[in-house]
Amino acid sequence: MSTPKAPGLAVLPVSKSEGGASVRTLQPSGWPTPKGYANGMAADGRIVVTGGVIGWDSKGHLANGFLAQVRQTLVNIAVILAEGGARPEHLVRLTWYVIDMDEYLASLKELGMIYREIFGAHYPAMALVQVVRLVEKAARVEIEATAVVPR
């Protein structure tokens, strides 16, 4: 399977009631609504989990630069999810590992645009962790994803 390039990857249509869709955003009463993520998710179904995914293409070439790596990483996650029968709206958790928190924070607008281009406006629970480095020395971001496909 080859990895699609982001511009050709349309946001997959959201399935309204696939098997009694049972993914629900958890928003405690009185808490401010988060922007770009959820406080928590509740789901019932078959779990699809990725490993740590980085921004290399189907030929093993790492994208150049932080935003390009994020884009390719999210595309790669979409491909892995599809392979497991999952769609973007099935995502319940993303854990981001970055080597430069300042670079991430300076790119929030662009990151949001890239995210929505690939996954639409579905925002699962997310965590962001700064690390000293990643296994692939030139990688600037690595993301793990968990999805739950309704039964």
Give the residues covered by each predicted segment.
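N-terminal presequence-like segments and the immediate start of the first folded domain
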Residues: 1-92, 98-151
